[in-house]
């Protein structure tokens, strides 16, 4: 039994899509053990069509559907949102016209900001984590042009992670973690939060203690085309059967 189950937390799944492309939902069930049903999209209006033609719903509407589904009695839930409004290939519904990245990014940020303001006003104790899958390659470099992701370069694989506590008093100001971290640090932060008693005891949350000595991870990125690693202050790339060479950004 995982720490989530031992602590009495109920898992939930909310997507802005149907989860069928490349069997994403089934993969979560098979490899991550996430068994709850996917929250329905009843009453939600599509704002984009995905590259496979399936509907993509408003980020804010999906977040509101989570909030509206919360039981009136306090309960512990841990929710995975998977939001693909920024995926390449998204199009205007019914027209097939491609959409620029910037207005979609601005809309997503507005939706997230609105949702965070609503969380703040609600007083509900929440830890919100925003973890991008990868960068959009808006800018190119000396090896790979903009929008291409054939090589998992640092511009694509090094993404910021955002964590914010709502409804809890904290003893520390905003903290920036600039050490090399990965999903291991995110998982450790969640585990520490659950076991800290912050949600069951009326005591200030010590962010410094919560984030100190999080696991560090060397930068290693790989796909079917290439591998990219960081050694000291430089990045190196290996293309399939070729030798390692400097990745010149």
Model-predicted segments: where are they?
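A long, amphipathic alpha-helix that forms part
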Residues: 56-74, 89-131, 185-187
């Amino acid at each position: 039994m995982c720490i989530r189950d031992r602590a009495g937390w109920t898992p939930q799944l909310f997507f802005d899509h149907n989860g069928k492309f490349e069997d994403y939902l089934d993969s979560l069930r098979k490899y991550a053990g996430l068994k709850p049903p996917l929250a329905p999209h009843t009453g939600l209006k599509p704002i984009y069509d995905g590259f496979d033609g399936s509907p993509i719903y408003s980020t804010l509407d999906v977040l509101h559907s989570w909030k509206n589904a919360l039981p009136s009695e306090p309960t512990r839930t841990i929710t995975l949102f998977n939001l693909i409004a920024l995926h390449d290939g998204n199009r205007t519904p019914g027209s097939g016209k491609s959409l620029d990245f910037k207005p979609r990014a601005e809309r997503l940020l507005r939706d997230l900001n609105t949702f965070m303001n609503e969380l703040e006003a609600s007083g509900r104790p929440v830890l919100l984590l925003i973890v991008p899958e990868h960068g959009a390659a808006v800018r190119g470099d000396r090896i790979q042009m903009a929008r291409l992701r054939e090589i998992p370069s640092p511009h694509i694989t090094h993404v910021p992670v955002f964590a914010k506590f709502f409804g809890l008093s904290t003893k520390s100001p905003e903290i920036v973690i600039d050490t090399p971290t990965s999903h291991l640090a995110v998982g450790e932060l969640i585990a520490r939060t659950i076991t800290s008693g912050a949600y069951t005891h009326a005591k200030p949350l010590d962010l410094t203690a919560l984030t100190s000595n999080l696991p560090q991870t060397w930068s290693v990125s790989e796909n079917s085309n290439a591998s990219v690693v960081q050694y000291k202050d430089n990045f190196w790339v290996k293309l399939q059967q070729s030798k390692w060479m400097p990745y010149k950004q």
